[in-house]
Amino acid sequence: MGNCLTTQKGEPDKPADRIKLDDPPTIGVGVGVPQIPMPSHAGQPPEQIRPVPQIPESETAGANAKIFVALYDYDARTDEDLSFRKGEHLEILNDTQGDWWLARSKKTRSEGYIPSNYVAKLKSIEAEPWYFRKIKRIEAEKKLLLPENEHGAFLIRDSESRHNDYSLSVRDGDTVKHYRIRQLDEGGFFIARRTTFRTLQELVEHYSKDSDGLCVNLCKPCVQIEKPVTEGLSHRTRDQWEIDRTSLKFVRKLGSGQFGDVWEGLWNNTTPVAIKTLKSGTMDPKDFLAEAQIMKKLRHTKLIQLYAVCTVEEPIYIITELMKHGSLLEYLQAIAGKGRSLKMQTLIDMAAQIAAGMAYLESQNYIHRDLAARNVLVGDGNIVKIADFGLARLIKEDEYEARVGARFPIKWTAPEAANYSKFSIKSDVWSFGILLTELVTYGRIPYPGMTNAEVLTQVEHGYRMPQPPNCEPRLYEIMLECWHKDPMRRPTFETLQWKLEDFYTSDQSDYKEAQAY
């Protein structure tokens, strides 16, 4: 097949070759549009910033210095931050303060704080552009089959089933093949026992030159579509959940919901964010701040990152990451409005992503209470994330009670929750079943032609929506399981996640053995 990629020995300082791509009812937090490019040099922030403490060169120089390499570009958000470019070498001066580290650029000698998930230790496997850490096989397949990747694109990930082993995933035309990388007791790695390697880097170099039994030579590493989300806005705000509302700039109104508006904005004149403003009187600020302290600890790739809040005065502001394509509801309706459609495989994958986020909330004993397509947000590559988790509980009862004509989302709510206010993770499962109908009908309102009062009565008497047009029978069976009258007989989100992931996974994705040619 010829050489597509050659990893040269003796060049450990060569920057990792990552490909950078720019990154009705209630509207979900963080609804957005294409992100504003961050300026290379941040403007003067609205608050006085303490100068970064200077550490003498002698304290960190020498053999024990921690040298890391930048995996992505980063532009300073405050005067405390350090801007850097992908491939730049950084000396870590202090890594004891959580997710933001104090660093010095080896190139410019400037110092400042950096997000720790934007860098990796020099010469480590984490610094390699083909290492994707702990992602599932299904996620590897999705990434490799993106149009940005070509035949021979590959990645290495941690094995899902074998501790200390790895898996190699390779794009072969329109399919993905997987190979187990096993580790020898005495050290080293192999796919086929006839050929062993001291390091994963050597393994990649070998199979880049010669397929040696694989389906194809390894070519370019799988592209990275998204930059990671930082944990909080900056080092300065890591323990400062409440921020000054004067640090926010409202750029463009994105939409209005029942309880407030959603804006595209800037924090500190540097950082694109989504700002949700809650109408005065919607919820008690003290209750919201207490709930926000819990919400900020919920971290998962399928949950919208909550950055900060403004609760000192009303209206309350909620500041989150900005998603490029807005709410799932509007995204689906826009696709249908243009006469287009998505593959059923894509829709089911979106459902699996939502189930993964809800499985995490389930594991944390946390209830969403308002799971619907309007509260799920969409990014590039049909990546979806759950928003507004937990907020419904805080809405004042006179604003959000289960009565006909009120703002309560009757058609998404389990009967025990709508009639008796018995909310649980199992009532979220019911709502997930309704969300599945929104997916396959491109945002159609559930129970078409029925009023809220009719829905309450009919569902209580056993009525369930019929199978939507063009819906896979197996998917409709999952919907019916979600709508079981007995909450305890509804599936867990963990079960829903693997059912939907297995639904997506093709039979051709089994692990392969390297062939002896």
Curated annotation (Swiss-Prot):
Compositional bias (Basic and acidic residues): 10-23
Keywords of the record: ATP-binding, Developmental protein, Kinase, Nucleotide-binding, SH2 domain, SH3 domain, Transferase, Tyrosine-protein kinase
EC number: 2.7.10.2
Ranges of residues in domain SH2: 130-222
Tissue/organ expression: Ubiquitous in early embryos, in stages 13-16 expression is seen in visceral mesoderm, hindgut, brain, anal pads and ventral ganglions. In larvae, expression is in CNS, wing disk, leg disk and photoreceptor precursors in the eye-antenna disks posterior to the morphogenetic furrow.
Reaction(s) catalysed (UniProt annotation): L-tyrosyl-[protein] + ATP = O-phospho-L-tyrosyl-[protein] + ADP + H(+)
GO MF annotations in UniProt: ATP binding; non-membrane spanning protein tyrosine kinase activity; protein tyrosine kinase activity; signaling receptor binding
Tagged with keyword Nucleotide-binding: yes
Chain ranges of the SH3 domain: 63-124
GO biological process terms held by the UniProt record: actin filament bundle assembly; adherens junction organization; apoptotic cell clearance; axon guidance; cell differentiation; cell migration; cell surface receptor protein tyrosine kinase signaling pathway; compound eye development
Region ranges (Disordered): 1-47
Signal peptide stretch: none
Gene Ontology CC: cytoplasm; cytosol; plasma membrane
Binding site residues for ATP: L254, G255, S256, G257, Q258, F259, G260, D261, V262, K276
Disruption phenotype: Following epithelial wounding, no migration of macrophages to wound sites. RNAi-mediated knockdown in glial cells potently suppresses glial phagocytic activity with drpr not recruited to severed maxillary palp axons, blockage of glial hypertrophy, blockage of drpr up-regulation after antennal ablation and reduced clearance of severed axons in the central nervous system.
Location of the Protein kinase domain: 248-504
Family assignment from sequence similarity: Belongs to the protein kinase superfamily. Tyr protein kinase family. SRC subfamily.
Protein known as: Tyrosine-protein kinase Src42A
Underlying gene: Src42A
